[in-house]
């Protein structure tokens, strides 16, 4: 089965597509667009130009995933939208333009997902994972 994830970060938006069969996960697509959403935040408010950039990129990636008939498309946002005061306005704008709005995840959930992904692909038994993002840093 195919799965797609659109990760909306403070600096980039990434589309990842995976094939999952019999417990094996094979990455198929890894596409990134550097949009610099953090640069569109003024006094804690994302300005309309930033909303437009986010919506265009999410919409393009969502269309790519739908064109592959991927049944499960997850769209997540991290600190890029977690920390803005006009979060609801931004989500509404993205939903209207792109047809889908990201789920905003907490820093704790972001760290949990980092851990799951990293331990699967890196086969780590012990260690520390540091995810240095544009708007937050998680330690696992």
Where are the regions that the model predicts?
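Nucleotide/phosphate-binding catalytic cleft detector across ATP-hydrolyzing
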Residues: 1-8, 16-132, 140
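Active-site-adjacent helix-turn-beta-strand microarchitecture at beta-sheet edges
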Residues: 136
């Amino acid at each position: 089965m195919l799965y797609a994830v659109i990760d909306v970060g403070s600096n980039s938006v990434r589309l990842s597509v995976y094939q999952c069969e019999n417990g094996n996960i094979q990455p198929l697509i890894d596409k990134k667009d550097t949009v610099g959403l953090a640069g569109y935040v003024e006094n804690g408010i994302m300005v309309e130009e930033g909303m437009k950039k986010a919506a265009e990129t999410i919409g393009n990636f969502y269309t790519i995933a739908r064109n592959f008939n991927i049944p499960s498309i997850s769209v997540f946002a991290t600190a890029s939208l977690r920390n803005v005061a006009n979060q609801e306005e931004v989500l509404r704008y993205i939903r209207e333009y792109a047809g889908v709005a990201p789920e905003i995840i907490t820093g704790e959930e972001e760290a949990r997902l980092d851990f799951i992904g990293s331990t699967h692909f890196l086969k780590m038994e012990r260690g520390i994972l540091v995810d240095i993002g544009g708007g937050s840093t998680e330690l696992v």
